[in-house]
C-alpha cells in the first residue's frame, strides 16, 4: 500500500479528527478514463515511457480486486501470482462521513446504512499497521470496529481503512474474514491537484 507507517509516537485519537470529511471509493475515482493519462505520466516518471502504460495498468489492478475473505484466501492459495487487494467499500456503503469520532455510512441513494461514535481501542499488528476503534452501540454488527491506517487527506491525499464485527480478524491481512481487503477512500470534493498527487504516490 501507499500509506504512511504506524509510529510509536502517533496519536490515534487525533487521527479520527484528521480524517474528517466525506469519502467516496478511491479507485472508482482514480480508474475513471479521464485519469488514464495521469497514471501513464506518473508511471513514466518512475519506469520510463516505454513501460509506463503497462505499469499503470498493473498498479491499478493490484488494488481493484473483487473478492476478499475466505474466497480470496482459497483463490490465491491456488494461484498466488494472481493475488490482489479489494480496496472498495463493502456492506452496502457508497460514502463514508467521518466527523470527530462519528462515522456514518451512506448508500448510493444517500440513505444511512450505519451511524456510530467510535473510540480508540488499540494498535493493530505491524503487518496491517492500523489503529482500531470501536463503538459501544450494541446493534453495530458489521460496523462495530473501524481500523484506520495513518493516512489522511493532508498527508497522503487519501485514507485506508477496514471495518467489521469480527475482532479477531481485524488485524489480519492475508487470512480470515477480511483477508485481501482494505477500503480506500478519497474526499468526494477532491480537486485535480489532490488526485494528481495520490496517483503519483501510488506510482512511486
Label the predicted regions:
Residues 5-24:
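N-terminal helix-cap/turn-to-beta initiation motif at the start of protein domains
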Residues 1-2:
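C-terminal segment of classical bacterial N-terminal signal peptides
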Residues 35-44:
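Short Gly/aromatic-enriched secondary-structure transition segments
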